[in-house]
């Protein structure tokens, strides 16, 4: 659900960056060595903002080799690195719950927890993604209600050192 292109080396990232000029280039997530990947993204494509899935893409969902605890440790280390770059972070956790049939409360709570952790790790700009029509049975008023609740809770964390930008996007489901 979501696709992607396998890129196998820093040289391939550099090649993509060079042929993409002047477009913005970014990447989504990895399944292991997350801190090292974040550094590669900075060095090769000058990533505009980082995206992390925190506790997905591991043994829990069958998409990676790590256990959940190790995945979280790697992501927390990566968040500290991202904070040092002063780049935004997009924690794209909620829609992964939605893909797996979770309700809107789980969606909203996971967004809030990811935002709170991001702030604690020193992230200054959070990109709050809200994937609409996920699951596909939702639409319109339901999406607006979910967005408003999520935005109200997460924006409550804002201060002079932490800003939240809403990124609504079409669903992939």
Model feature map: region roles:
Residues 1-115, 119-125, 129-131:
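Catalytic alpha/beta active-site cores
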Residues 40-44, 145-149, 159:
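Short, surface-exposed basic-aromatic patches at helix termini and helix-loop junctions that form
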Residues 68, 104, 140-147:
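Flexible, glycine- and charge-enriched loops at secondary-structure boundaries
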Residues 132-143, 164:
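Generic multipass alpha-helical transmembrane bundles of integral membrane proteins
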Residues 154:
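Conserved, mostly hydrophobic/aromatic
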Residues 158-166:
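Flexible, glycine/charged-enriched surface loops at secondary-structure junctions
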Residues 168-173:
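Extended amphipathic alpha-helical segments with heptad-repeat/coiled-coil character used for oligomerization
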